């Protein structure tokens, strides 16, 4: 598993991979709204019954990957995720078109059903998954064969621990979408794609 230190280094290395197009009259993106829980939300985030097995199956039906973004009220990095990364059309479009992204609150009380059938409140699940930073994005496999009674923490194929600038952020989503994790470490992927 990649460490936060390694990830930050990779994020800086990937900085030149994306020439972000600014938001303009020709390229409008509505600003995000804030939900009742104090979290910014994207209109394309999925809203479900919070059963991860069902969410993954639905993502597959849509031809997408399933990922969870953990956030919290008052998190400045979470705010930047929405006001910086998701305001870049290339980033927003790639994530929206290729992932079913479910937003959870590290302090939330909604009941979530993990892949192994365990039902926990969001905050309990965040502890179970060892979510230490916000935003954190967990990426899960696209197949059901991997479940076999395992929790999401054991199933995740990649994790983005904290805020990354748009180039590195997009690179991680591409890494997962292409299933590059099956053959490369993230650093190797960055090295190969930045050439």
Predicted regions located by residue number:
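N-terminal export signals
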Residues: 6-25
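N-proximal helix/coil linker or "cap" segments that precede and/or mark the start of modular domains
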Residues: 26-44
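A short beta-strand-turn-helix
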Residues: 48-64
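Short active-site neighborhood of thiol/selenol oxidoreductases, capturing the structured segment around
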Residues: 62-75
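Typically the conserved alpha-helix immediately C-terminal to a functionally engaged Cys/Sec
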Residues: 79-94
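Thiol-based oxidoreductase modules, predominantly thioredoxin-like and allied folds used
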Residues: 92-120
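Structural micro-motif
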Residues: 122-138
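Non-catalytic, surface beta->alpha helical segment in thiol-disulfide oxidoreductase systems
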Residues: 133, 141-181
